């Protein structure tokens, strides 16, 4: 899984730029895992969560990763009823990630969201979330898998050159 995430992030950044100089990746909130995945590459890593002035780092960004983590505050998607369902929330992080997402969209900077990061992209773009899937949907949707997390996926793409760059062993 770590290798896959590294490949996806590397692919997004390499495919969107022809410049071979060291790229600056902004992580919304760094953890040792994210730093380790990117450390051996030609990336300079900036942890946005540790910055006092987000505006000062935005112009450095060659790519942005909205990382995984705690629940997004339901007030960000207009649902005060979910406040009691959500676990730990971090309003500062929510604000930072929304700003990073908006900046990436406006400047057409490559970005990727991992778990919570994908949820933040949805919320920042006006979407909503289920505060707690088992509470809101019951047991009809299996949300947690304590076993194997790998599974087959169907890839459909009009430009197979990009797919073959990520998965060279794939036969089409």
Spans of model-derived segments:
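N-terminal beta1-alpha1 cap of cysteine-dependent amidohydrolase-like domains
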Residues: 2-4, 15-114, 122-130, 134-169
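Sec-dependent signal peptide hydrophobic core
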Residues: 5-9
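Conserved SAM-binding loop
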Residues: 117
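Active-site oxyanion/phosphate-handling segment shared across diverse enzymes
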Residues: 172
């Amino acid at each position: 899984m770590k290798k896959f995430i590294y490949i996806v992030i590397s692919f997004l950044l390499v495919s969107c730029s022809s410049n071979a100089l060291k790229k600056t990746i902004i992580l919304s909130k760094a953890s040792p895992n994210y730093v380790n995945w990117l450390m051996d590459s030609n990336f300079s890593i900036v942890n946005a969560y540790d910055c006092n002035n987000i505006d000062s780092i935005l112009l450095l960004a060659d790519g942005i990763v909205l990382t995984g983590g705690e629940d997004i505050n339901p007030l960000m998607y207009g649902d005060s009823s979910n406040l009691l369902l959500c676990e730990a929330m971090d309003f500062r992080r929510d604000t930072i990630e929304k700003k990073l997402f908006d900046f990436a969209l406006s400047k057409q900077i490559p970005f990727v969201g991992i778990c919570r990061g994908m949820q933040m992209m949805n919320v920042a773009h006006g979407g909503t979330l289920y505060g707690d899937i088992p509470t809101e949907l019951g047991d009809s949707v299996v949300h947690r898998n304590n076993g194997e997390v790998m599974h087959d996926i169907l890839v459909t793409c009009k430009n197979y050159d990009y797919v073959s760059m990520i998965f060279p062993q794939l036969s089409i």
